[in-house]
Regions:
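Short, conserved SAM-binding/catalytic segment
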Residues: 1-6
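Phosphate/diphosphate-binding loops
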Residues: 9
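A conserved structural/catalytic subdomain of Rossmann-like adenosyl-cofactor enzymes
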Residues: 13, 18-256
Length: 256
């Protein structure tokens, strides 16, 4: 599992988020981060206090995104998996996305199709790629299609690395400032300016304007939308639960 390393000496079991963000010093910053942070879960009480007030949340994926921005060196690059909920989420998520697009160049979002992590979760996911040090001017989107004849992924027919050859050919090289201005739009690729993203309150869950939508009765189209609605409801409930928990904790401290 660890590429033939029988006894890894530099791997430890711990909660990275338990360390206060301010304690990560310049010597610990890195050039490249590739990660699939846990998502869909909530951190234990008190973990959020390790982060600045404007970013405090108990949602694991959100805190990891804040941590990544901290530990990347200037000019460093990151690629990570995040759920749709991060893209369309509001409140703390909006503030985190605003910081990301201000401090980093979020140049590419690869929108993965439904079922990539089946059977473990049906949550739709995305691949985000950014570099630190220059602000975002535009975000390129690439809608990863199913292979010919497929309508979903599963444990016996998972997504394969060979399917990303099209993205690799399209990717291209950035200019000296780190922007991908020479990329071409297509049926699966499009760009959105930072002004448009700001006017949409940093909602990054943007549809492909170049694709003809399926009919309203298409199950393969409706199911992901239904699942997204369920995720939005779950996030709202989690946010309300967290606010209620904080209010009760404050009341308890005030009466003790």
């Amino acid at each position: 599992m660890l590429h033939g390393i029988d006894v890894p000496s530099n791997v430890r079991h711990d909660n990275t988020l338990a360390r206060p963000l301010r304690d990560w010093g310049p010597k610990e910053r890195v050039d490249v981060i590739v990660t699939n942070p846990p998502f869909g879960g909530m951190e234990e009480d008190g973990i959020e206090a390790n982060y600045p007030a404007e970013f405090r949340t108990r949602e694991t994926a959100d805190l990891f995104l804040v941590l990544l921005m901290k530990v990347l060196k200037p000019g460093g690059r990151a690629g990570l998996v995040l759920p749709d909920g991060t893209l369309f989420g509001e409140g703390v998520k909006t503030r985190i996305k605003e910081a990301l697009l201000t401090e980093c160049n979020l140049h590419t979002i690869v929108r993965l199709p439904n079922g990539v992590f089946n059977p473990y979760t049906s949550i739709r996911t995305n691949l985000l790629f950014f570099s630190k040090g220059t602000p975002t001017k535009e975000v390129w989107y690439y809608e990863h299609p199913y292979p010919a004849g497929a309508k979903s992924y599963n444990k016996t027919k998972p997504i394969r690395i060979e399917e990303f050859e099209a993205e690799k050919k399209w990717w291209g090289k950035p200019d000296k400032a780190g922007y991908y201005s020479k990329r071409q739009e297509s049926e699966v690729a499009w760009r959105v300016s930072i002004d448009a993203i700001k006017s949409g309150n940093y909602n990054l869950d943007l549809k492909n304007p170049n694709r003809t939508d399926e009919g309203p009765g298409d199950v393969e189209h409706l199911l992901p939308e239904y699942e997204k609605l369920l995720e939005q409801i779950a996030q709202t409930r989690a946010r309300l639960r967290e606010e209620l928990h904080q209010a009760l904790s404050a009341t308890s401290r005030g009466t003790s």
